[in-house]
């Protein structure tokens, strides 16, 4: 059982015994003081020690000092003429203060435990293949280059490449998505995924400490070091607020009695009010609940595959006015696919068949898209004399016919009269024996949720969405139009993108922020320059995790909407706590100043407000994406 809880229980029993003695035996005041000091010290010796330590180090004004002064003052008030002893009240105040502290520690521990459970993605053991035998060892003892075996139902312990086996991986702990990902030999796997079906043999590429799972856990746990504006405000507020409260309490204790008939009698009344004032003025609810709100928000976001590197970025996300997207790999897949087939005198299937066979040995992205669209090359077709002509295309003999696949220059070189295409994309022309046979349009495939993501941002009041791309003007503008982007800048070099970003930062509204969303590979300068740098699709990408302020672990632009929604709700809960705590405290402080609040009421108000604020803060752990 918790030591503090035992002290509280023992202190409560001793307080009851002391109260019983006080009401059954007539003892001098100093003897009753000694009796009540026993439960007081059992319950509050650490508070007294912290108060004295703070005084010795020059850090006088904190909650321990306020409680020490208020309770010792209540103990001593009974020695004033015509004053009633307040021993029981003093011990009870300390008892309740410690109960509040206990609840605070419990709530924080539970929050951290919940986050650790959510991020429990590192297995304690792994199966490593050594000397032809499978050994179960701790993952941190496995070196780069060794081979591990991942059985169905087990979690991948280290990042690596599959050298044997086929399976499906559950990546929900990393990406927040429940759809399994199919993997086979040659694919990369990252630690934290759960193997669903087949046995996988994986060659380790990163040590345990450098694995994706370890970096994610470290990032979430260290996120609290970067304080939000609200946290920084509360820290400054407490430093100024507490000394002011002590000064007001001193004035309240000693100035009003000067204007009363009997100074000593009035001093007793006003001193009690001042001590009550001190008890209720303790800023625990604010100091505890605000950081807990942001910590919970960061943990809650991690459940959805969103890693926020600090509470300050929750502030920045909630104040976004402009979101800038890189096109390739962010709004589009970065992979070509066939958009249209326009044959001339032959069938569409035959046109695609010829293009795919001519390009069958090429690794160019356009060639890959043609082969994927055709799907089946094992049809007995004879392909000979394949020649790649730089800057033009590929020429080959297919079943005795010379087939050219390439751009307009290729068609001009063989005398084929080609046609322009109205479909936006890269046009691949085809000729057969010098006669034009048609063209195929390939384009970078837009992500399925890109349009929904932009619509979601607009619905949240983000007034400016911008896309940056190095693509041709017509290609970039077509993508922007299809997804609903407000502004598009095309034909940009990497250095140009940073210049555009600087212009947008200069134009943004005051007290609003700008986010840049990229794939984290070539966007490090832009990610660093934006108010919030967001790396998308960073599963297994060290560069993205290091460079960005916010990391979206999968490839869905809609996760940006989720990140902003969670940030705004987290900030809303933190603000609720601020206004609730300040409102209740101001009310009870006023009641204490005019003598309408007792010390019992004050401690109930202080601890009660803290408990409610902490419970409200813990809601951030379960924020949904909707």
Model-derived features: where do they sit?
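Actuator/coupling domain of P-type ATPases
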Residues: 19-22, 36-125, 129, 141-148, ...
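Juxtamembrane helix-loop transition segments at the membrane interface in multi-pass membrane proteins
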Residues: 52-61, 103-117, 292-311, 618-626
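N-terminal membrane topogenic signal
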Residues: 1-12, 241
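P-type ATPase nucleotide-binding
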Residues: 338-464, 473, 482-501
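Conserved ATP-binding TGD loop and adjacent catalytic N/P-domain core of P-type ATPases
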Residues: 400, 432-576
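Bilayer-spanning, highly hydrophobic alpha-helical transmembrane segments
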Residues: 12-13, 232-261, 274-294, 575-604
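Membrane-embedded transport module
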Residues: 508-511, 548, 553-626
């Amino acid at each position: 059982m918790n030591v503090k809880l035992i002290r509280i229980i023992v202190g409560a029993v001793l307080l009851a015994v002391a109260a019983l003695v006080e009401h059954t035996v007539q003892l001098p005041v100093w003897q009753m003081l000694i009796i009540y000091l026993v439960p007081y010290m059992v319950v509050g010796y650490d508070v007294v020690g912290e108060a004295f330590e703070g005084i010795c180090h020059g850090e006088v004004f904190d909650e321990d000092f306020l409680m020490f002064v208020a309770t010792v003052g209540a103990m001593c008030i009974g020695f004033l003429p015509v004053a009633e002893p307040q021993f029981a009240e003093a011990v009870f105040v300390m008892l309740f203060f410690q109960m509040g502290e206990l609840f605070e520690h419990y709530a924080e521990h539970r929050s951290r435990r919940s986050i650790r459970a959510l991020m429990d993605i590192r297995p304690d053991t792994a199966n490593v293949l050594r000397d032809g035998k499978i050994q179960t060892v701790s993952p941190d003892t496995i070196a780069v280059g060794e081979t591990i075996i991942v059985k169905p139902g087990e979690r991948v312990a280290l990042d690596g490449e599959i050298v044997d086996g086929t399976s499906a991986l559950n990546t929900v702990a990393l990406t927040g998505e429940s759809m399994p990902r199919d993997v086979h030999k040659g694919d990369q796997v990252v630690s934290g995924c759960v193997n669903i079906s087949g046995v996988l043999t994986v060659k380790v590429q990163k040590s345990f400490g450098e694995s994706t799972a370890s970096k994610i856990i470290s990032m979430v746990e260290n996120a609290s070091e970067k304080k939000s504006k609200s946290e920084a405000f509360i820290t400054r507020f407490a430093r100024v607020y507490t000394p002011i409260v002590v000064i007001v309490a001193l004035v309240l204790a000693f100035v009003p009695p000067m204007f009363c008939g009997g100074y000593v009698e009035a001093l007793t009344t006003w001193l009690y009010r001042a001590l009550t004032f001190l008890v209720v003025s303790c800023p625990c609810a604010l100091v505890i609940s605000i950081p807990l709100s942001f910590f919970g928000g960061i943990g809650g976001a991690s459940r959805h595959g969103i890693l926020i590197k600090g509470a300050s970025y929750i502030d920045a996300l909630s104040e976004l006015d402009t979101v800038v997207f890189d096109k390739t790999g962010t709004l589009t897949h970065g992979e070509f696919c066939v958009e249209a087939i326009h044959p001339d005198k032959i069938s569409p299937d035959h046109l695609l068949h010829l293009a795919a066979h001519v390009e069958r040995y090429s690794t160019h992205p356009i060639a890959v898209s043609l082969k994927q669209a055709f799907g089946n090359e094992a049809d007995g077709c004879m392909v000979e004399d394949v020649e790649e002509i730089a800057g033009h295309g590929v020429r080959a003999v297919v079943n005795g016919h010379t087939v050219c696949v390439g751009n307009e220059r290729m068609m001009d070189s063989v005398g084929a009269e080609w046609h322009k295409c109205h479909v936006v994309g890269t046009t691949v022309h085809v000729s057969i024996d010098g006669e034009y046979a048609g063209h195929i349009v390939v384009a970078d495939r837009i992500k399925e949720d890109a349009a929904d993501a932009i619509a979601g941002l607009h619905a949240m009041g983000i007034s400016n969405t911008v896309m940056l791309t190095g693509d041709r003007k017509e290609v970039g503008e077509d993508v922007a139009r299809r997804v609903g982007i407000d502004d598009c800048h095309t034909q940009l070099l990497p250095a140009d993108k940073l210049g555009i970003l600087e212009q947008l930062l200069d134009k943004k509204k005051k007290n609003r922020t700008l986010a840049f969303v990229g794939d984290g590979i070539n966007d490090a300068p832009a990610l660093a320059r934006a108010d919030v740098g967001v790396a998308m699709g960073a599963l297994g990408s060290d560069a993205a995790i290091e460079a960005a302020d916010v990391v979206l672990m999968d490839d869905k632009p809609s996760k940006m909407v989720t990140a902003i929604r969670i940030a705004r709700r987290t900030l809303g809960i933190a603000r609720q706590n601020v206004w609730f705590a300040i409102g209740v405290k101001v009310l009870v402080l006023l009641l204490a100043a005019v003598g309408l609040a007792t010390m019992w009421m004050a401690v109930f108000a202080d601890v009660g407000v803290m408990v409610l604020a902490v419970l409200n803060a813990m809601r951030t752990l379960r924020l949904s994406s909707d």
